[in-house]
Amino acid sequence: ALICPGNTLDLTERELEVVRRYWEDEKGGLVFYLDASAKTPNMNALLREHGVGPRGDRVLSVLSIPGMTSKKTYDVAVALMPGAGPTKDLPALTTQLMGQTQSLDVLYEDDLLIAENIRPRPLMAAREGFWGETDFQTEEVSYNPDIDHGQPELVYTSASVEKGVAGDYDFKKGSSRLVVVGNPDLISPDGNTSKVGADFTMASLNWVMNREELIGITPRRPTAYTLSVSAEDQGLLQSLMIFMMPGLALIIGGVVWVRRRA
């Protein structure tokens, strides 16, 4: 699989041709983590061609605290969407996308794409209260239904695409797969990747490489805990084990013996 984690430079025409050939002809896997501030028209064109359009906005919300000035936040609370694709074996987990995120226009009901056997699907949606703001550079923002995205429609921040041979709607002849996220920091080079982000990334890589059997929540690393017991508590535990428990067993045995003799 080929992963592009937050590319700040666009693909050249030659690189785009190589990537397209790898994906369509060799049925390779692609994973894009888009940098919302980067200008990548060639990469975006490839995605739009297959039903996923980066919008160039910023997903945000406004925090209102009584007595304080309202403040916009770019840390987006998102939920994974169950269904076909890399999230099908993951429960409806939630996480935060840190930094700046752009929303995605996912054409999962487009008749033309369906006829061409191209299946885009949303994978992540922002929680209630977030929207795709087009005029995000201004200090004070508010949702404008004429130019912004969301409310009441869901704001998608990740999507998958599966493309098969024309007429092969069950993908029995194989398929080309890609996953795109509108945020470059789902996996952090500083080692601050969330558990949900790591699970989603591994699931995406396994899915685009047709290794569905490996998709799921990764096992947690065993952690050793030390239980500190004071001298007084230790003496109490010893008394319970030496006197109380044998005494209790003796009493129960005596009761049973008496009842049987009666």
What are these regions (language model features)?
Residues 186, 216-241:
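Short, aromatic-rich amphipathic segments at membrane interfaces
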